[in-house]
Amino acid sequence: MGGVMEKFHGAYVAIITPFINGEVDEQSFVDLIEFQIANGTHGIVPCGTTGESATLSFDEHKQVMDLAIKTVAGRVPVIAGAGANNTLEAIDLSESAKESGADAILSVAPYYNKPSQEGIYQHFKAIAEAVDIPMFLYNVPGRTVVNIAPETTARLAGIDNIIGIKEACGCLEQISDVIRKCPEDFIVLSGDDFTSMPTNVIGGKGVISVISNVFPKGMAEMQEATFAGDWDRARQLHYQMYDMMKQMFAAPSPAPAKKALELMGVIREGLPRIPMTPIDDDNLANLKLAMKGLNLI
């Protein structure tokens, strides 16, 4: 690697969207981005699942994208969340991301309406043909109730500007099948912190990470260790972060990550937006233990 991380490889943070008094907290968001870059994060992914995109208005979505791109100022790549289960809406969000100057977009499989594999293909094909910007597919069947089959991913990989996938199926067998079926330059990023290291072992190129919100240095170092072939160090870091990885999803995400960032003083208020709710006292106690284990508090 020559010490330089290739574009769209490594530890990308699925960054939270801070709120205060019910509005986007721009100052906390800027502070969080600076915290990320100072601690080695390789890229920023705003307006994804962890960014509570489902409860952002279109104007807020653009506000967050614009602020992320302006704050990053070219220091690391920005992959903007631009997905929707309405293909026309996904095209609008993708056009907005391109206008804002995003390096790429992340587009989730259509959720709730449960399309066939052909429907999934046509959805992503329509977006790719409408907006000329590098595009990552996003497979997260635990949330969307549809799985992008490896054969469909391979078919979509034949479209020029579809350059990779965030694979959050949680199944190494499927991830292996995707890597095996797709061209060598197709970028497979883990969508789960737990599978981030093993995904790189089998040919993945990085992760879009939740734990990176609170421990960016650890995830970035683990990714760099895998690319350097230092598997002992990568494994050590994986298990060092293990308890915190569990706590990030001990309550519905991103509530634990937001509370942790509040406790660390990185953001002013760690409340998610309804229908997400703050973590309870038991989860808070466990979160604090995991944070102390990483010397975060």
Curated annotation (Swiss-Prot):
Disulphide bridges: none
Site features described as Part of a proton relay during catalysis, chain residue numbers: 49, 112
Any single biological process term in GO: diaminopimelate biosynthetic process
Regions crossing the membrane: none
HAMAP family recorded: DapA
Protein name (database record): 4-hydroxy-tetrahydrodipicolinate synthase
CDD domains linked to this entry: DHDPS (cd00950)
MF (Gene Ontology): 4-hydroxy-tetrahydrodipicolinate synthase activity
Residues annotated as signal peptide: none
Key word Amino-acid biosynthesis present: yes
Organism of origin: Desulfotalea psychrophila (strain LSv54 / DSM 12343)
Catalytic activity of the protein: L-aspartate 4-semialdehyde + pyruvate = (2S,4S)-4-hydroxy-2,3,4,5-tetrahydrodipicolinate + H2O + H(+)
Keywords, sorted A to Z: Amino-acid biosynthesis, Cytoplasm, Diaminopimelate biosynthesis, Lyase, Lysine biosynthesis, Schiff base
Function: Catalyzes the condensation of (S)-aspartate-beta-semialdehyde [(S)-ASA] and pyruvate to 4-hydroxy-tetrahydrodipicolinate (HTPA).
Active site: 138, 166
Superkingdom assignment: Bacteria
Record-linked SUPFAM superfamilies: Aldolase
Annotated family: Belongs to the DapA family.
Pathway: Amino-acid biosynthesis; L-lysine biosynthesis via DAP pathway; (S)-tetrahydrodipicolinate from L-aspartate: step 3/4
Keyword NAD included in the entry's annotation: no
